[in-house]
Structure formats: structure tokens, C-alpha cells
């Protein structure tokens, strides 16, 4: 699937190593390979954006290596492709040897997979399913400040799905563990690949059922009900959390204005 990049090759360039992304001038490189000193590198086409190929090159650059978070303001489709590249680069880097027999592996020519040359085991990129949920109580939404976000941003609750658990069960468990309340009338909204490092966010809306807020201090700094027209600092646009909050606000406006 990969090939050597030639002088006239062009497109978007995802140059990644150890979950970092090359961002010269703070931007995702776009243009001819020669302009970025990429001729002769091995590259894998991982998609297209607006008719232009998106290439993945697994390489460490001396300067301008940053986080994929820095390009979160890109168009959603291009951000997702950049995230795909970072995740694939880390997958190939971390699967050089078979976890069963220890022998060297090689990339498949037909799909994103690594194959063992000895025991024939096949490995695919790992995806960690997560739930994220906006909880409404009359004209208010439950928002929390997470311990990992000490920048004042308040957001909705989220967490990883556990082994042997449905998405619906994960919502109920995470909400109870983090906030101490029960929810009802769960409704699926959308999903979003989230490369931090390899999550797939499944987004829901729910209604408050019962209970008082009792936070898990290992997860949350604080949580509270906020009226739809008096909200704290929110996650940036383009995130699924922001969409859930805005959808909830729209529902409240329609009902209370």
C-alpha cells in the first residue's frame, strides 16, 4: 500500500512519530512533496480531502513536531484524516513484533493491518469506544470540570466503555460513578473519532432521573446544573462535546423562550 514519494507528488502531508504531528508554521503541510523535502520518503495514502490525496509519512522531524490538537480548528473531515494518520503511525510503530510469538511483523498490502511472518497472526489498529452524554434537567444542563482540564473549561460527562458492556450500560455507569445521579430516556446523537490517543466517541443525550450530585474527586473538580442561558467556559467548536451542549441549549430555548 505504501510507496516512495516522487518529486511531483502533492497533497496533504501527515508526518507523524510517537503521536506527534509535523506542523511547520503551525499548519498541516499542503502542496508538492519537494517543497517539504519529502521526496524519497515512504508514504501511505490514507484518504482524500477535497480531491487531494492525504499522505502518511512515519518520520520524526527535528523541529515543529506538535499535537494533533493544534489542528482541531481544521475542517472536520481533514482533522479526522490527520487523526487517522497519527493513530496509524503509532499502530505501525507499536506493532513491529508479534505479541504471541515475538517474531517480526510486516504491514499488509491490502488493509491497515500488521501480519506475523511466523504464526500468521493478524493485528488491526486498536479503537477504544467511549461514551459522552449531555444530561438535561428542565432548563439546565449538567456540566463538570474534569481534573485533567484545569483551564476552566466545563463539559459534559464521558468515559470508556468496559469489556462486556453495552453503550447504554456504559452511560448509566459512568454518570453514576462520576456524578452520583441516574438518567433516563437515553438518545443516540452522533459519533466522532477522537485521536487522543485512539478513541471513538459515541454521543448521547439523556434526561435527569434522580439523585443528588456527588462527584468522584479523582475524575472531577466540580459539577453543577447550569441554566441554558448562563453557561461557563465551554469546549471549543468542532468537538462532539460542544455539539451536545449546543443541541441541549437549542432544546431549552425552544421550550422556555
UniProtKB/Swiss-Prot annotation:
Keywords: Hydrolase, Magnesium, Manganese, Metal-binding, NAD, Zinc. Its EC number is 3.6.1.-, 3.6.1.22. Zn(2+) binds at residues 98, 101, 116, 119. Its cofactor is Mg(2+); Mn(2+); Zn(2+). A divalent metal cation 3 binds at residues 174, 178, 219. Substrate binds at residues 25, 69, 111, 124, 192-199, 241. It is an enzyme of class 3 (hydrolase). One of its GO terms (cellular component) is cytosol. It catalyses: a 5'-end NAD(+)-phospho-ribonucleoside in mRNA + H2O = a 5'-end phospho-adenosine-phospho-ribonucleoside in mRNA + beta-nicotinamide D-ribonucleotide + 2 H(+); NAD(+) + H2O = beta-nicotinamide D-ribonucleotide + AMP + 2 H(+); NADH + H2O = reduced beta-nicotinamide D-ribonucleotide + AMP + 2 H(+). Pfam families: NUDIX, Zn_ribbon_NUD. mRNA decapping enzyme that specifically removes the nicotinamide adenine dinucleotide (NAD) cap from a subset of mRNAs by hydrolyzing the diphosphate linkage to produce nicotinamide mononucleotide (NMN) and 5' monophosphate mRNA. The NAD-cap is present at the 5'-end of some mRNAs and stabilizes RNA against 5'-processing. Has preference for mRNAs with a 5'-end purine. Catalyzes the hydrolysis of a broad range of dinucleotide pyrophosphates. Belongs to the Nudix hydrolase family. NudC subfamily. This is NAD-capped RNA hydrolase NudC. It comes from Escherichia coli O17:K52:H18 (strain UMN026 / ExPEC).
Amino acid at each position: 500500500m505504501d510507496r516512495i514519494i516522487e518529486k511531483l507528488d502533492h497533497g496533504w502531508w501527515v508526518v507523524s512519530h510517537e503521536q506527534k504531528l509535523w506542523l511547520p508554521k503551525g499548519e498541516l503541510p499542503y502542496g508538492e512533496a519537494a517543497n517539504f523535502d519529502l521526496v524519497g520518503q515512504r508514504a501511505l495514502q490514507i484518504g482524500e480531502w477535497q480531491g487531494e490525496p492525504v499522505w502518511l509519512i512515519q518520520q520524526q522531524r527535528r523541529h515543529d513536531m506538535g499535537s494533533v490538537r493544534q489542528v482541531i480548528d481544521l475542517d472536520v473531515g481533514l482533522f479526522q484524516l490527520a487523526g487517522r494518520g497519527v493513530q496509524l503511525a503509532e499502530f505501525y510503530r507499536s506493532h513491529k513484533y508479534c505479541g504471541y510469538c515475538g517474531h517480526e511483523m510486516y504491514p499488509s498490502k491490502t488493509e491497515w493491518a500488521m501480519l506475523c511472518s511466523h504464526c500468521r497472526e493478524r493485528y488491526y489498529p486498536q479503537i477504544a469506544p467511549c461514551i459522552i452524554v449531555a444530561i438535561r434537567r428542565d432548563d439546565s444542563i449538567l456540566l463538570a470540570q474534569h481534573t485533567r482540564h484545569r483551564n476552566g473549561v466545563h463539559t459534559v460527562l464521558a468515559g470508556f466503555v468496559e469489556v462486556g458492556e453495552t453503550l447504554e450500560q456504559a452511560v448509566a455507569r459512568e454518570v453514576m460513578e462520576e456524578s452520583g445521579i441516574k438518567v433516563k430516556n437515553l438518545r443516540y446523537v452522533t459519533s466522532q473519532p477522537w485521536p487522543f490517543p485512539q478513541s471513538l466517541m459515541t454521543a448521547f443525550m439523556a434526561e435527569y432521573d434522580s439523585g443528588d450530585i456527588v462527584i468522584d474527586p479523582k475524575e472531577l473538580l466540580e459539577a453543577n446544573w447550569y441554566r441554558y442561558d448562563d453557561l461557563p467556559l465551554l469546549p471549543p467548536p468542532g468537538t462532539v462535546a460542544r455539539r451536545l451542549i449546543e443541541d441541549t441549549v437549542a432544546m431549552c430555548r425552544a421550550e422556555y423562550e
